């Protein structure tokens, strides 16, 4: 029963994010067709829309994050994707590798959540000689 509730919560969260992504700041960050976002982080005119691959994160299994970065011209550059657990004051045991795919799209591979709880994704972005750190939370069961 608890597993079913977790799946329902994740599906509801994804639907809310999809509606928010589709309606808020659509001109600032257009999501290509077929890209079903898991989350979004915004700060000072920079937006990162991302999805996890696979969409459902399994504890103890590696996963990837595909991110789209939008913002002022020239396009901001994503320099790092990481995650940590603020309540536990620790991060992942693995360092993901980040690769640029062009047109503001990036893929980080090798992420792994080893325990349930609230995780915070961190995106470091450089634009106009300035570094900005964007973050957003995700509950993992």
Task: Please place each PLM-identified region on the residue numbering.
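Bacterial N-terminal signal peptides that target proteins for export
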Residues: 2-14
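Signals and flexible motifs at protein termini associated with secretion
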Residues: 6-8, 23-27
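Bacterial N-terminal signal peptides
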Residues: 11-23
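Contiguous segments within soluble domain cores/interaction surfaces
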Residues: 27-141
């Amino acid at each position: 029963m608890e597993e079913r509730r977790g799946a329902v919560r994740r599906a509801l969260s994804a639907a809310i994010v999809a509606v928010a992504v589709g309606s808020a700041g659509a001109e600032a960050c257009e999501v290509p067709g077929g890209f079903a976002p898991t989350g979004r982080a915004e700060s000072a005119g920079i937006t990162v829309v991302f999805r996890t691959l696979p969409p459902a994160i399994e504890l103890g299994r590696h996963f990837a994050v595909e991110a789209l970065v939008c913002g002022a011209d020239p396009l901001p550059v994503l320099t790092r994707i990481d995650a940590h657990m603020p309540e536990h004051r620790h991060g992942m045991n693995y360092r993901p590798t980040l690769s640029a795919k062009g047109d503001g799209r990036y893929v980080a591979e090798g992420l792994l959540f080893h325990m349930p709880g609230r995780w915070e994704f961190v995106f470091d972005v450089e634009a106009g000689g300035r570094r900005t750190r964007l973050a957003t939370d995700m509950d993992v069961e």
